[in-house]
From Swiss-Prot:
Keywords: Cytoplasm, Endonuclease, Hydrolase, Nuclease, tRNA processing. SUPFAM superfamilies: Rnp2-like (SSF160350). This is Ribonuclease P protein component 2. One of its GO terms (cellular component) is cytoplasm. It comes from the Archaea. Its EC number is 3.1.26.5. The lineage of its organism: Archaea, Methanobacteriati, Methanobacteriota, Thermococci, Thermococcales.
Amino acid sequence: MMRKLKTLPPTLRDKNRYIAFEIISDGDFTKDEVKELIWKSSLEVLGETGTAIVKPWLIKFDPNTKTGIVRCDREYVEYLRFALMLVSEFNGKRLIIRTLGVSGTIKRLKRKFLAKYGWK
């Protein structure tokens, strides 16, 4: 009989922060393109080691409003914001990624920063 692994207590879990962002561009983007954009910009600016430390992860993206949520490590929020800020072009489309805000929970992030874009 296999034993079930115990879950980590909250004191040992990774502390995450969630960043709300908006893509300002004439072109449209899919969730997969945004995921690739975040990874490529993070790798270019921070390198492989830095990206592994920051742990960027796209949680949700709405292609209609071009807004989304990305998760990262609590200690390295500014590194990811910096990496996203430097993006100016992707797949031949000019764009700007604007950070709307940072929060410790997705619920609070939606309520505070993404409510005006129709997120619930």
